[in-house]
Every structure is written in structure tokens, then in C-alpha cells.
Amino acid sequence: KFQYRDRSEGCLAEFDFGLISDETNHPYRVQCEQFKLNMYLENWLKTQGVEDIHFNHTVSKLKQDDQGLTVYAETPEGEKSFSGKWLIGADGANSVVRKLCSIDFEGFTWEERFLVVSTPYEYEKTINDLSFVNYFADPEQWFFLLKVPGFWRVMFPVQNNENEVSIFSKDQIEKRMQWVLATGEPFDISHTTLYKVHQRVANHYRHNRVFL
């Protein structure tokens, strides 16, 4: 389920994915942190017989010809190289592989940024009828409240004129959290991050032996 809520009035609408269970085998919304997804993928790859999995490797350059390609990576032990027939670059919006292939990333980046604060505070014990996914409307500022195992995540829009030092300051984080729910006690903050949102697409998805 997920809800649209008014900060003052409570739940305005609730959507139950269970109502479409006869239409799909997956009547739910999945929220999975990147580090957990990486662990799941690592375990799955091992079950598929993949033995060489490397962490803390940053691709720095690549060379390719008609026979294959070589990727060079910076590692804690220095530069290493890996050779093969094909390369798939699945390294996100700031893809090094895409940049090394000079593939344009056309579109734009939204000016608005989004601050995410994670806390073990149990909002469900304080806010009545709270879902695990909640979009809050308010005349002053909207926000998003999301439950993941062990934590609640609160997402706020951030003004363009706010600098990162101010955004991540302990006082500003606490001020935002108390605005969502005034507890009178400091929140235990587990994690904070600032996101940019891109509306972009790669100009093309293949460069000889490299795929995005």
C-alpha cells in the first residue's frame, strides 16, 4: 500500500496493490537500497558460476579492436587490466564507461535537489494509520516518508540557494526532522544523502564492443 497524506489532516487516499493481484504476479512496490542489491547480485552471480567479482575497482580507461577489448581499473593495489570480448557498462548516470566511449548523455538535470535522511525513529507508533510509503502535501513544503527494514527515510526538496555545508549541518537536519514531527528530542540520524534528478538518455547504447 501507499498513501497520499496531508500533513495536518492525515490520509487523503490509500492505494492497495493487492487489488491488482489477479492482474500481476507482483502486486507490490519494491524498495531496495543499492548496497543490499549489490550483495544480492553478488550472491546470485556466484550461484551462476561467476568466480571473479571485484570491489573497489574504478574503471580508468579502455582499449578495443576487432578481436576484443581491455579495461583498465584503479584499485587499492594499483592499476589492473581485464580483457574480454565484450564490455557492458552498467555504472549509472555518471557512467565512466559511457564517458570513455564519448557517448552523449542528452537531456537536462533538474535544478531541484532532494535530501534523504534515514532514522530508526518509529514513525508508525506516532502517526496514525501510516503506510510504509507516504507522500505528504503541505502548503509550506512537501515531503516523502518511506519505510525500509530497520529505518524510516524522509525525503525533502532542497532550495537551489542552499549550500551543501548548510544542508548537511546537524542543526539544519534536526530542524527539518522536527518540522515533520516535533518530538522534543533529537533524532538519531543514521544516514544522509543529497540527490540530483536527471532527465537524460544516452545518444546510443553501443560503441563497437561496448554496450550500455
Identify the residue ranges that each predicted region occupies.
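Well-ordered beta-strand positions in beta-sheet-rich domains
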Residues: E14, S81-S83, V116
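A structured beta-alpha segment of the ubiquitous adenosine-cofactor-binding alpha/beta core
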Residues: A73-K80, K85
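A conserved beta-strand/loop element that lines the FAD pocket in flavoprotein oxidoreductases
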Residues: L45-S60, P186
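Active-site-adjacent segment of FAD-dependent monooxygenases/related oxidoreductases
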Residues: K1-K46, K63, A137, L146
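Short, mixed charged/polar active-site loops
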Residues: L12, E79-S81, W142
